[in-house]
């Protein structure tokens, strides 16, 4: 009698780690989790620490922490001082030299929150790729999430990289984000930028599509239950449809004359509109980072300057932008010691 003994292939440390990372647990870790969880934890933790304890006195001349009397809407982790340029502001770098207090005073917490936040978002997108591959579905969730990542990178990284320093990026707070919106309007006339227009159309269009789709599905649910609550009429394992696409198609055909007849095309369109808008707005931010102008109607400005009776909404907005610049620059960039003569400053409602 012959006995055949098969050799058991030895498993290396990589295989053991791979099995552990992909083990079925309540919160999936995966290889992407090695990037996502530490970066997300450090970014969120840095933001809570910064808004609670860290002042912006040395970078912006402002109070920005709960410790100084700010509330949730006015607290922020502010950008580094303009003099820091585009330094990474590492804790052990030449600016702080390992001094944590000094590092916070220079604005290093903003770099910490922003860079870890960027890698955390990338880790979240990779997580969607990884799980999609493991459960054998398409990776369109990850593709869709590239839109928010593009906006994050363009606003918090690309824009200040195109300017003189990190100082001109948005600080991490509610009121500070509003200040940034006013700043980019006054200095870049962003609302007249076609890429910003596409971004607005994409986001609001996506919200409209979402509302219409949800309402239409609710309108055309099959009566699978006698309960007042229609949710109980659905089972996640049921094979049949839960609403009538035919009825929905007929409804919108009567409303508009046209309607989606293909569920796959309908849902792709709902994906395409907001993601394209996000990417377009990201491209627009890269453009203004390089101080590119869009839609300067110089002929109207010249005519308005020559003819006091000629004015358009465009020329009015240009004057408003000049007012924003004149008022914001001395307040926002106090280190520049801007002094404007009285005759160029806006006066009341006259501008």
From Swiss-Prot:
It is a multi-pass membrane protein. One of its GO terms (biological process) is photosynthetic electron transport in photosystem II. Chlorophyll a PD2 binds at residue 196. Pheophytin a binds at residues 128, 141. It is found in: Cellular thylakoid membrane. Belongs to the reaction center PufL/M/PsbA/D family. This is Photosystem II D2 protein 2.
């Amino acid at each position: 009698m012959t006995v055949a003994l098969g050799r058991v292939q030895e498993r290396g440390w990589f295989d053991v780690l791979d099995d552990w990372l992909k083990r079925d647990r309540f919160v999936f870790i995966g290889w992407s989790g090695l990037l996502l969880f530490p970066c997300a934890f450090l970014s969120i933790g840095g933001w809570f620490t910064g808004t609670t304890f860290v002042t912006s006195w040395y970078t912006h001349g402002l109070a920005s922490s709960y410790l100084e009397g700010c509330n949730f809407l006015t607290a922020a982790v502010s950008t580094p001082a303009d003099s820091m340029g585009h330094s990474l502001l590492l804790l052990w770098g030449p600016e702080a030299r390992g001094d944590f207090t000094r590092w916070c005073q220079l604005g290093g917490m903003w770099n910490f929150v922003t860079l870890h936040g960027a890698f955390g978002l990338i880790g979240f997108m990779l997580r969607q790729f990884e799980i999609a591959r493991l459960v054998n579905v398409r990776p369109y969730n990850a593709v869709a999430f590239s839109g928010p990542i593009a906006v994050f990178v363009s606003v918090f990284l690309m824009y200040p990289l195109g300017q003189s320093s990190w100082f001109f990026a948005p600080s991490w707070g509610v009121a500070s984000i509003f200040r940034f919106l006013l700043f980019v309007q006054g200095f870049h006339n962003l609302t007249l930028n076609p890429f910003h227009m596409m971004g607005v159309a994409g986001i609001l269009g996506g919200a409209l599509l979402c509302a219409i789709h949800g309402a239409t599905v609710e309108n055309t649910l099959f009566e699978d239950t006698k309960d007042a609550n229609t949710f109980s009429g659905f089972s996640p394992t049921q094979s049949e449809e839960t609403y009538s696409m035919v009825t929905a198609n007929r409804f919108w055909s009567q409303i508009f004359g046209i309607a989606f007849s293909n569920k796959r095309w309908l849902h792709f369109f709902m994906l395409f509109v907001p993601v394209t808008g996000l990417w377009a707005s990201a491209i627009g931010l890269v453009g203004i980072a390089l101080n590119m102008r869009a839609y300067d109607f110089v002929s109207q400005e010249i005519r308005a300057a020559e003819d006091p009776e000629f004015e358009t909404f465009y020329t009015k907005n240009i004057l408003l932008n000049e007012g924003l610049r004149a008022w914001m620059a001395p307040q926002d960039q106090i280190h520049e010691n801007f002094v404007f003569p009285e005759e160029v400053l806006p006066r009341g409602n006259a501008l």
